[in-house]
């Protein structure tokens, strides 16, 4: 699933210098290079810069992952997947560094979870999402991504809870999670690790929720708007 990337604005640091003398003369020189004090970026500013670099890395990794999904040639698919994994690993380092610089930056914790999940580290991903949601309760993207991690661990009841939370507050992300649930069902069909009875029950629940979502689409602002286009 392609993530919705969000860059954070970085304040511009400018040092104001007045002209020397009444006639706008040159600055005094000590004869030994530029002696002007340089503004040191705060840890929060460094965290934003590092976070934005991580977002760019995630965008590239997502593109490689999508390319791998489209490939029919096994060698090309493997190459694209390897490129995606390298990109996610690089992004994870950046987001982890951002959390070290600013531990209260919930966006960075959310992306730590996202990249960990993309690398298959679902338990670590859940821990990162919990940190994000502790800092920003109700943060919809973290709730959605956590739902994906629950699916990766076959924790279906918790994945359902994540969907229902999103359904009441963010139908767009709820729909994305429902799509992921359908993909999970298709991938798990015939897998020995999943009880067929449990799988069928979950599939029925997903179908039911999909029907409800379609029937109530017009009650949302986006759904109502689409009817008049």
Regions found by a protein language model. Name each.
Residues 80-93, 118-131, 154-162:
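Structural signature of tandem alpha-helical TPR/SEL1-like repeats
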Residues 23-38, 168-229:
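Terminal, low-structured helical/coil segments at or just beyond the last alpha-helical repeat
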Residues 97-100, 130-134, 168:
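Conserved structural position within tetratricopeptide repeats
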Residues 40, 47, 106-107, 140-141, ...:
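Helix-start (N-cap) detector for alpha-helical repeat units in TPR-like alpha-solenoids
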Residues 59, 118, 152-153, 187:
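Register position in tetratricopeptide repeats
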Residues 111, 145, 179-180:
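Canonical tetratricopeptide repeat
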